[in-house]
Amino acid sequence: MALGDVYSGVFTESDSLWHQLKTASEAEHDLCWRMPLTDMYLPQISKLNADLVNTGGRPAGACTAAIFLKQFVHGLEDRTKGEEQCVQYAHIDIAGSMEAASNTLNDYQAKGLTGRPVRALVEFARRLAYTS
């Protein structure tokens, strides 16, 4: 919710994936913003009664959700690339952008549930299909 209803938060370690998502989101006026994906949030999801918990409490909720997912994705090999390259991934936080508080965001989106960031993701997939 830190970004309100204007931007979807994107957490990724991959600069190239971030660039692709940002470009697609700008083309569709379905904006996203890169957020910090840092291990500094790891203590918030580490507890005595479990290795990890899927929520770190109210502070930095999107950041702790992203660092939780990183624990399961980070280090996975992308076998399509040969060698040992890690899978590129992004966590997109839509808590704020999934619902518009007013009709002022853009011309095609009314107040209420928005379906965001579907337009950006479809454009991202379309561009990815043409480059593969």
Residue ranges and their predicted role:
Residues 1-132:
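A generic structural signal for tightly packed, nonpolar segments enriched in small/aliphatic residues
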